[in-house]
Amino acid sequence: MAKRQLNRRQNWRIEKIQGERAARAAKRESATLETLEGGDLGPEQTGLVIAHFGVQVEVEAQEGEASGQVFRCHLRANLPALVTGDRVVWRAGNQGIGVIVAQLPRTTELRRPDSRGQLKPVAANVDLIVIVFAPMPEPHANLIDRYLVAAEHAGIRPLLLLNKADLIDEQNAPALNALLAVYRTLGYPVLEVSAHHGDGMQTLQSQLDGHISVFVGQSGVGKSSLVNSLLPETDTRVGPLSEVSGQGTHTTTTARLFHFPRGGDLIDSPGIREFGLGHVSRADVEAGFIEFNDLIGTCRFRDCKHDREPGCALLKGLEDGRVQQQRMNSYRSIIASLPQDSY
């Protein structure tokens, strides 16, 4: 069934109701926090945010006798927005409840615009972003390239992961092989696995060990199945592909951090159908296409838009084969989607 379009008044009413609910929840949270801080709280200690639930988070103790134990924590009002992967300072209260008093500096931050265009962090302290795609739903180079630009912009190393490799057949193999060849030529690490059959999963595990990783990709590519295969003790529901759209149905409802037995962590985040890049500039996008590095700045005109201008280094690179047409198409699509003031 097609998604019903809402008019401006309906959207306003929905936002008003959601705002009122959020205000009531914040008021209850403030009262609970006052009660906690008025009682006996333990000493300050470091912790790791492993899940976020509205106005509360789950924190894993990182030191002392409680190390490894998980506590549901309230947040002081003066704290910035916390996300899974954040390192924090917190104090334990009674009955497994605690209070977060400070956020520790982040080494990296993965952000994306929300529905209103406001930047929203989705994961912190990640050093490996695993871009997951599959034969079905059909992978799109433009979406993969958006993730790559986001990874380069955030300073996070990317890994391209083709899941459901068992679904490769004579019909889709040529297009998939051509797609993967582009990224392998650029030097990006590419793995082909099947979470369902277990093929390639040990190789994937070795790539994840020792890192804080996040899986990103559109719904239906098997992110939850990958988590279940890597960590069988977890309980991540797997959703089917929509028969109407051929895309996946969302299963994971909150970003959650899991530990690997041999070290390293995995953040499983909700499915993302489209990764907006409205928060980056033209220069950021150009830097995100690594094959452009030696070409940018060498065009005849300083304000070259890399479209039809004479003496354009990118167009010359396209002719010479240094730049692939698929990547140039993605670049132009991303640039066209940027706000005009990003130029």
Curated annotation (Swiss-Prot):
Record family assignment: Belongs to the TRAFAC class YlqF/YawG GTPase family. RsgA subfamily.
Ligand binding (Zn(2+)): C299, C304, H306, C312
Domain CP-type G intervals: 116-275
Protein name as it appears in the record: Small ribosomal subunit biogenesis GTPase RsgA
Subunit comment: Monomer. Associates with 30S ribosomal subunit, binds 16S rRNA.
Gene Ontology terms describing biological process: ribosomal small subunit biogenesis
Co-factor note (free text): Binds 1 zinc ion per subunit.
Binding site for GTP: N163, K164, A165, D166, G217, Q218, S219, G220, V221, G222, K223, S224, S225
Cofactor requirements of the protein: Zn(2+)
Function field: One of several proteins that assist in the late maturation steps of the functional core of the 30S ribosomal subunit. Helps release RbfA from mature subunits. May play a role in the assembly of ribosomal proteins into the subunit. Circularly permuted GTPase that catalyzes slow GTP hydrolysis, GTPase activity is stimulated by the 30S ribosomal subunit.
Molecular function via GO: GTP binding; GTPase activity; metal ion binding; rRNA binding
Top-level division of the source organism's lineage: Bacteria
Documented EC number(s): 3.6.1.-
Gene3D superfamilies assigned: Nucleic acid-binding proteins, P-loop containing nucleotide triphosphate hydrolases, Probable gtpase engc, domain 3
